[in-house]
């Protein structure tokens, strides 16, 4: 089973940069998007063979998530049941017979860390949500977590120590997710590899120089460990400031 997650930084813009060709080439069983930045009715994607599920932010041109899946889920839930968080369209959960699939667009702490306090509330509530799901079925969660966990997960750790996405607080929260048992699937296969990133600033020719961050993840419940088959970061695929990340799993 092949799963893809991609922060498209605006699906309408990404469509103009070859999204549909990349989608077809990747041929995923489940394809998750973050930061779709659209409202209902603004985008009509013809994707034969896929069921589509979209969650929208209340504001125009902000946040949003989507999931395209070849197999119809048993149920779909939008959000995590907390209005403060759910108004931004950040989470979609698909229930299948043997697992839950959750896609997430974690809030960015923003410049001057003005949203860090809110981010900490989000982290606590979202982890509680995942753990609650896990009580009944294993969980696969993917998306833009807006954090580089370790120094090997970004090009310039020293100069970014107090910047959004690499603060001690954000890293500690992601650490708690892993301490609760979830597996960072890319690091499961590549524990020490450096220079593999999923996001690059549009400034300073960052992508050309590979001055990036690994902030897009697939994490899974520990009981799926023996079913993990592979993980990839598709840095060759353009169309966004992020690239798609992949999980191969037998389910």
What does each of the following model-derived ranges do?
Residues 24, 30, 51, 125-211, ...:
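Metal-dependent phosphoesterases centered on the DNase I-like endonuclease/exonuclease/phosphatase
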Residues 37, 42-109:
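Structured beta-strand-rich core segments of catalytic domains in phosphoester-bond hydrolases
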Residues 234-251:
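Surface polyanion/phosphate-binding segment centered on an Asp-His-Pro turn
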Residues 1-47, 51, 57-63, 149:
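N-terminal, active-site-proximal structural segment of metallo-dependent hydrolase catalytic domains
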Residues 81-82, 107-123, 158-163:
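Surface-exposed cleft-lining segments at the edges of enzyme active sites
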Residues 70, 94-97, 221-222, 247-251:
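Active-site beta-strand termini and strand-to-loop segments that position acidic
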Residues 60-75, 204-226:
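Conserved beta strand-loop-helix elements of the APE1-like EEP
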Residues 1-9, 98-110, 142:
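Active-site-proximal beta-strand elements of phosphoester/diester hydrolases
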